[in-house]
Regions:
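Generic alpha-helix initiation/capping and coil-helix boundary signal
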Residues: 2-8, 383, 402
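Eukaryotic scaffold repeat domains enriched in small/polar residues
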Residues: 23-433, 443-444, 450-500
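Sec-dependent N-terminal signal peptides of Gram-positive bacterial secreted proteins and lipoproteins
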Residues: 3-25, 475-481
């Protein structure tokens, strides 16, 4: 009996060990991409992106390990990494096969300055002419160098009455436009983006965030003593975490330090798109707000809302926000609809320990991890490529081709709302209004359904105008005819009476 029990126990133990050994492999192969349906329920999705490669110090063959890298910038087929802890910038080149290789290490420049090295550079940008702009945070300056690393000029702390004299200038993130104007996010300066003219002069603060406050807290502060006020939280604008200049010259700006209640109340936006007046022109017509995960509960030891630490935008107007809280990437289209969401915290490929920056070359995504000191490269899957093809074809006016691409995407993911809406929009442009209405109805798209219905009704009226006129005429003439017959009948009846 004991032998039987021992055998059963051994078999069970072996089964458990086998299960444990196979579970991680299953988890690794399982899709970690998701979206939301109309009701807000999470819907698993085929992967939109897959990991193409992960580059660490070893894979890149660096002379020494990266140390707390903070910035990433793509220019053509070149990728620039701010190796912040090593006080340098690494220039990488992408080969034909997509592999990255080191071009040079940039740790000093030529010029008649006392300090010609960097101290904790946190961001970099390259102009069309090849000039390099560097947020040299530790040296309290923004540098402009030519393509041969000759010093051109520097941008210093703004001279403005709103900035205290003892403020240390800490440029953190920057962007440049085609005219050579510089936009900077500086730690400790919450007036908005610092805008410099091409000659280095401070121009203005741009796009300061709205101040959100609790009315009860406001009343408390209004009637509090000076000592009590000093202990209370001040109602001040929130600093931006990062900025990105898109191909049209608009600035995407993200805010990581957001509160759940402010996001849900709509008093704060996690990402904005600023025009040259500093106005937020980001379209938010999506089913859900543009702030990452719509559920903010505790999971895996992480709680609170998504905290966007960087953003990048493709030429097809899809912009991707990087969440440093849960290590996820959220892609949105130009209407604010969620295109994809994927990622997570961890050590596996496609997961992150401390995502710091995001960039793109074509539609490939590059994510810099400041803790693991690695660059993860993502390429579109078949599903993702169908979606991008459909968007591009629609923008070119190739509506039939766009419809077919959306159909292929739908075949791979029958729960993908955008595919149904995309098919409907393509049919709408092809003037197939009745079919378009059917697709919009399936996904409860009332706005587009209304557009299709109005056109369908208009055409139906035009095609049946003769019948409509006939019915209207009959509606009016038949009662008149019946009345006339009755009148004649009464006259006849009266005539018969008088004859009698």
């Amino acid at each position: 009996m004991k032998k039987i029990i021992t055998g059963i126990a051994a078999f069970a133990l072996a089964a458990m060990v086998f299960a444990e050994s196979t579970l991680p492999a299953f988890a690794m192969n399982k899709s970690y991409t998701y979206n939301y349906d109309y009701w807000g329920d999470v819907q698993n999705s085929p992967d939109f992106y897959s990991v193409q490669n992960v580059y660490t110090t070893t894979e890149l063959g660096l002379d020494k390990p990266m140390k707390t890298p903070q910035g990433l910038y793509a220019f053509g087929d070149s990728l620039y990494v701010c190796d912040t802890g090593n006080n340098r910038i690494i220039e990488l080149s992408r080969g034909e096969s997509g592999t990255l290789s080191v071009v040079r290490y940039i740790d000093e420049f030529k010029g008649d300055l006392e300090v010609t090295t960097f101290s904790s550079p946190t961001d970099v940008a390259i102009s069309e002419e090849g000039d390099m702009y560097i947020a040299d945070k530790g040296n309290a300056r923004i540098l402009k160098l030519d393509k041969d690393l000759n010093y051109v000029m520097q941008f210093n702390i703004p001279v403005d009455a709103s900035i205290e004299e003892n403020t240390t200038f800490q440029p953190n993130k920057l962007a440049i436009d085609t005219a050579g104007r510089v936009y900077c996010v500086a730690t400790g300066i919450n007036k908005g983006l610092i805008k410099y003219e091409p000659d280095g002069t401070f121009s203005q603060f741009l796009g300061a965030t709205e101040v959100s406050y609790n009315f009860l807290e406001y009343l408390k502060k209004r009637f509090a003593t000076q000592a009590q006020r000093e202990k209370m939280v001040s109602f001040v604008p929130t600093e931006y975490d990062n900025i990105y200049m898109d191909y049209e010259g608009f600035i995407y700006a993200c805010i990581g330090s957001v509160k759940e209640e402010d996001l849900k109340a709509g008093t704060v936006n996690a990402v904005r798109r600023l025009n040259m007046m500093g106005q937020d022109i980001l379209v938010r017509n999506g089913e859900f707000p543009v702030y990452g995960d719509i559920y903010m509960g505790n999971g895996g030891g992480v709680t609170g809302p998504s905290r966007f630490t960087d953003v990048t935008c493709f030429d097809n107007d899809v912009y991707v926000c990087l969440d440093k809280n849960r290590g996820r990437l959220f892609g949105y289209d130009d209407q604010g609809e969620l295109v994809f969401a994927f990622g997570g915290n961890g050590n596996h490929d496609g997961y992150f320990r401390q995502p710091t920056a995001i960039e793109h070359i074509g539609t490939d995504l590059y994510v810099l991890d400041g803790l693991s000191c690695s660059i993860t490269v993502f390429a579109t899957t078949e599903f993702g490529q169908y979606v991008y093809d459909a968007m591009e074809q629609f923008d070119k006016g190739e509506y039939d081709a766009s419809e077919q691409s959306w159909i292929k995407a739908k075949e791979l993911n029958g729960n993908y709302n955008l595919a149904y809406i995309g098919i409907g929009r393509a049919l709408l442009r092809q003037e197939k209004y009745k079919e378009a209405m059917e697709y919009f109805e399936l996904k409860y798209d009332a706005d587009n359904y209304s557009k299709a219905y109005k056109q369908y009704r208009k055409i139906w009226i035009e095609e049946n105008i003769g019948l409509i006129v006939l019915v209207i005429v009959l509606v009016f003439l038949v009662p008149l005819g019946i009345g006339k017959v009755r009148s004649i009948k009464r006259e006849i009846d009266m005539a018969d009476i008088f004859r009698v």
